[in-house]
From Swiss-Prot:
Function, as annotated: Bifunctional enzyme that catalyzes two sequential steps of tryptophan biosynthetic pathway. The first reaction is catalyzed by the isomerase, coded by the TrpF domain; the second reaction is catalyzed by the synthase, coded by the TrpC domain.
Disulphide-bridged cysteine pairs: none
UniProt keyword annotations, A-Z: Amino-acid biosynthesis, Aromatic amino acid biosynthesis, Decarboxylase, Isomerase, Lyase, Multifunctional enzyme, Tryptophan biosynthesis
Location of the region described as N-(5'-phosphoribosyl)anthranilate isomerase in the Swiss-Prot/TrEMBL record: 258-453
Protein name, as recorded: Tryptophan biosynthesis protein TrpCF
Protein's gene: trpC
Length: 453
């Protein structure tokens, strides 16, 4: 099926190119085209895994992905995380535009990749005129002579080339053609299915001189950690564009869905957010040394745009609902022996957007995670706040996409904890100088360690 879709896209692209040449002839702007000064190849080098983050409004497989598509706003967020930024410029199938390129380039200092079905040198001159620093060349669309001609034009303008392959034959061609950066598309061009094994199979054959980028189907930190053994970097678009909170979406993939719990001071919330946390925990349990009241919680929340989670233990349901509403909490976390009836009643009473998390104590065995209306589980040793870890080998083979791991997590063990495959980690006592007082250096160290791949 997809070969015909791809053939149709390319046929339509040829028509588009001819029309654009009439509307904006090469002679009308070629003298204004300056070589790029942002080096795509260099940007993807270095010890850490590279990320090409993509501005994408729609796609043939998903339709419109982001309704409020604002390239300036997206670039202002991506610039904090990306090695390079990809911009879809295909109009018919991806609702892209060449006009997006200068908008993104003006806001973000990274190299900008023009992502399109490029079949004519004209498109490369056009991309550079609109401030692109690199372009995509797809071996599924181009023969070797076309590729050489187009790559030569790009390099003459000091632009980089992302050479895309999707099977072994194209991978061998990429090597023979001397491609410096090869993108392995995990999407099957025939049926649009995703197979991450494609990266595992093709990457080792590309050799050490080639920078390998894994494309399509990457949407979790666990996938990134595992595939970073095969690829030098990742191109990620749809997994980010589908989320309203773009900062959180990027952090979720680069670092995991991590929470810093037991916040009592605004400066600690800011340090947690600056380090890379998504969630901030506010404890309303009177026996905790980190307990806060509503006024203190409001002070903490005003300091940083974390998604705040209220922590309760066997509280009266009306009290939980009241605090969730007054503070506009993202979630409530239940740390006592709340049963299904309590959870059902709470779900009825809470605003629909407030999630319910349930903390479970892990002893010799892993407790069942079978509650209705529970969105996430926090697995901890004991009742929480003990600073001790349980036997993580119990997590082997478990489906952990809605689980946060807690208990004594710090810079010394966070990587091992992340490798359990949990969606995220819950930090508390090991990032403190004393109970309730977070240490900004310890927080920074934890998140730098999580990003050291």
């Amino acid at each position: 099926m997809m070969q015909t879709v791809l053939a149709k896209i390319v046929a339509d692209k040829a028509i588009w190119v001819e029309a654009r040449k009439q509307q904006q002839p090469l002679a009308s702007f070629q003298n204004e085209v300056q070589p790029s000064t942002r080096h795509f190849y260099d940007a993807l080098q270095g010890a850490r895994t590279a990320f090409i983050l993509e501005c994408k409004k729609a796609s043939p497989s998903k339709g419109v992905i982001r309704d409020d598509f604002d390239p300036a706003r997206i670039a202002a967020i991506y610039k904090h995380y990306a090695s390079a930024i990809s911009v879809l410029t295909d109009e018919k199938y991806f609702q892209g535009s060449f006009n997006f390129l200068p908008i993104v380039s003006q806001i973000a200092p990274q190299p900008i990749l023009c992502k399109d079905f490029i079949i004519d040198p004209y498109q490369i001159y056009l991309a550079r005129y609109y401030q692109a620093d690199a372009c995509l060349l797809m071996l599924s669309v181009l023969d070797d002579d076309q590729y050489r001609q187009l790559a030569a034009v790009a390099h003459s303008l000091e632009m980089g080339v992302l050479t895309e392959v999707s099977n072994e034959e194209e991978q061998e061609r990429a090597i023979a053609l001397g491609a410096k950066v090869v993108g392995i598309n995990n999407r099957d061009l025939r049926d649009l299915s995703i197979d991450l094994n494609r990266t595992r199979e093709l990457a080792p054959k590309l050799g050490h001189n080639v920078t390998v980028i894994s494309e399509s189907g990457i949407n979790t930190y666990a996938q990134v950690r595992e595939l970073s053994h095969f690829a030098n970097g990742f191109l990620i678009g749809s997994a980010l564009m589908a989320h309203d909170d773009l900062h959180a979406a990027v952090r979720r993939v680069l670092l995991g869905e991590n929470k810093v719990c037991g916040l009592t001071r605004g400066q600690d919330a800011k340090a947690a957010y600056d380090a890379g946390a998504i969630y901030g925990g506010l404890i309303f349990v009177a026996t905790s040394p980190r307990c806060v009241n509503v006024e203190q919680a409001q002070e903490v929340m005003a300091a940083a745009p974390l998604q705040y989670v209220g922590v309760f233990r066997n509280h009266d349901i009306a009290d939980v609902v009241d605090k969730a509403k007054v503070l506009s909490l993202a979630a409530v976390q239940l740390h006592g022996n709340e049963e299904q009836l309590y959870i059902d009643t709470l779900r009825e009473a809470l605003p629909a957007h407030v999630a319910i998390w349930k903390a479970l104590s892990v002893g010799e065995t892993l407790p069942a995670r079978e509650f209705q209306h529970v969105d996430k589980y926090v697995l901890d040793n004991g009742q929480g706040g003990s600073g001790q870890r349980f036997d993580w080998s119990l997590l082997n083979g478990q489906s952990l996409g809605n689980v946060l791991l807690a208990g004594g997590l710090g810079a010394d063990n966070c990587v091992e904890a992340a490798q359990t495959g949990c969606a995220g980690l819950d930090f508390n006592s090991a990032v403190e100088s004393q109970p309730g007082i977070k240490d900004a250096r310890l927080l920074a160290s934890v998140f730098q360690t999580l990003r050291a791949y």
